[in-house]
């Protein structure tokens, strides 16, 4: 059992723990004959161009020296501005993992990942050196919250009062395969949370961000971050208590060491 996120100063709450077998597949490696998933690298917008392109035969193994987006983040030198290929190669896995944990399904996670990189590439020239991964967290999370609000608004405006709900279709084989690998118990517990609470818990207990970083990502005060995490964790406990078959599987709530 691995404690995700690690201890934090002044954080006496419990943290979400995930069983070691609940690893998410990486975004780019998800492209297989079984799933037939198109990777983001094939979706590079043709309308976007960048003078610095990276070919496959130019790729070298990482070294101890700063390279890629790390150089740009550290120096702010426009000459080291990353290309689309560099952004995707270095950050797609992490962005996809966050998008999946937030959205709870493969289709939305892929859409959020694609939209995140489009947004990043369009804005990278105006990026101020700081924490590049934190910037990615903020964009991904805000896009997710925007998606949730947009869908809620569409449902409220478009559905008539006498709308008959249609039962959901049975999960297709691709979704069954995907869920079996990704710990459906964990995702079901997270999906039970309101979007704002889910984002705070995912960023804290899965992505390992500090309360201050979460506040910057979500654009809320520190007290609001603490409240959302506390209430989100309590909601997880309530969910697990109501679904004991999940309590001994992939999701546990243990004290911070």
Swiss-Prot record:
Disruption phenotype: Increased susceptibility to detergent and heat shock, slighty decreased resistance to oxidative stress. Poor growth in both human and mouse macrophage-derived cell lines. Attenuated infection in both SCID and BALB/c mice. 13-fold decreased transcription of sigB, no change in its own transcript in culture. The sigE mutant induced the up-regulation of human and mouse macrophage gene expression, which correlated with an increased innate immune response. Residues 211-230 bind DNA. The lineage of its organism: Bacteria, Bacillati, Actinomycetota, Actinomycetes, Mycobacteriales. Sigma factors are initiation factors that promote the attachment of RNA polymerase to specific initiation sites and are then released. Extracytoplasmic function (ECF) sigma factors are held in an inactive form by an anti-sigma factor until released. Responds to heat shock and surface stress (detergent exposure). When combined with isolated core RNA polymerase from M.smegmatis is able to guide initiation from the sigB promoter. Required for full expression of sigB, and for sigB induction after detergent exposure but not after heat shock. The keyword tRNA processing does not apply. Belongs to the sigma-70 factor family. ECF subfamily. The sigma-70 factor domain-2 mediates sequence-specific interaction with the -10 element in promoter DNA, and plays an important role in melting the double-stranded DNA and the formation of the transcription bubble. The sigma-70 factor domain-2 mediates interaction with the RNA polymerase subunits RpoB and RpoC. Residues 186-236 are annotated as: Sigma-70 factor domain-4. The keyword Magnesium does not apply. GO terms for molecular function: DNA binding; sigma factor activity. Induction: Unlike many sigma factors not directly autoregulated. Expressed from 3 promoters. P1 is 55 nucleotides upstream of the major start codon, used during normal growth, repressed by surface stress, P2 is at the start codon, under control of MprAB and is induced following surface stress and alkaline pH leading to a leader-less RNA, while P3 is 63 nucleotides downstream of the major start codon, transcribed from a SigH-responsive promoter under conditions of oxidative stress and heat shock. One of its GO terms (biological process) is response to heat. A motif (Polymerase core binding) lies at residues 111-114. Interacts transiently with the RNA polymerase catalytic core formed by RpoA, RpoB, RpoC and RpoZ (2 alpha, 1 beta, 1 beta' and 1 omega subunit) to form the RNA polymerase holoenzyme that can initiate transcription. Interacts (via sigma-70 factor domain 4) with cognate anti-sigma-E factor RseA under reducing conditions, which stops the sigma factor from functioning. Inhibition is specific; RsaH and RsaL (anti-sigma-H and -L factors) do not inhibit SigE. It comes from the Bacteria. Keywords: DNA-binding, Sigma factor, Transcription, Transcription regulation. This is ECF RNA polymerase sigma factor SigE. Coiled coil: none annotated. Residues 87-153 are annotated as: Sigma-70 factor domain-2.
């Amino acid at each position: 059992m691995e404690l995700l996120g690690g201890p934090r100063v002044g954080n006496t709450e419990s943290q979400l723990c995930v069983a070691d077998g609940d690893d998410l597949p990486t975004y780019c490696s998800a492209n297989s004959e079984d799933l037939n998933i198109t990777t983001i690298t094939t979706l590079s917008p043709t309308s976007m161009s960048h003078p610095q392109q990276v070919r496959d035969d130019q790729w070298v193994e990482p070294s101890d020296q700063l390279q890629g987006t790390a150089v740009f983040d550290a120096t702010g030198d426009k000459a080291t501005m990353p290309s689309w290929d560099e952004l995707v190669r270095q950050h797609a896995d992490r962005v996809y993992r966050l998008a999946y944990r937030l959205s709870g399904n493969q289709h939305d996670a892929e859409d959020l990942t694609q939209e995140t990189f489009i947004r990043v590439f369009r804005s990278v020239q105006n990026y101020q050196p700081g924490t590049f991964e934190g910037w990615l967290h903020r964009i991904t999370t805000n896009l997710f919250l925007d998606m949730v609000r947009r869908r809620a608004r569409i449902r409220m405006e478009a559905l008539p009062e006498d709308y008959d709900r249609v039962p959901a279709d049975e999960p297709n084989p691709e979704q069954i395969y995907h869920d079996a690998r990704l710990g459906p118990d964990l995702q079901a517990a997270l999906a039970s949370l309101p979007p704002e609470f889910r984002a705070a818990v995912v960023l804290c207990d899965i992505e390992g961000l500090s309360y201050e970083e979460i506040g910057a990502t979500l654009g809320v005060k520190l007290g609001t971050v603490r409240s959302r995490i506390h209430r989100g964790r309590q909601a997880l406990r309530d969910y697990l208590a109501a679904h004991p078959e999940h309590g001994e599987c992939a999701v546990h709530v243990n004290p911070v060491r």
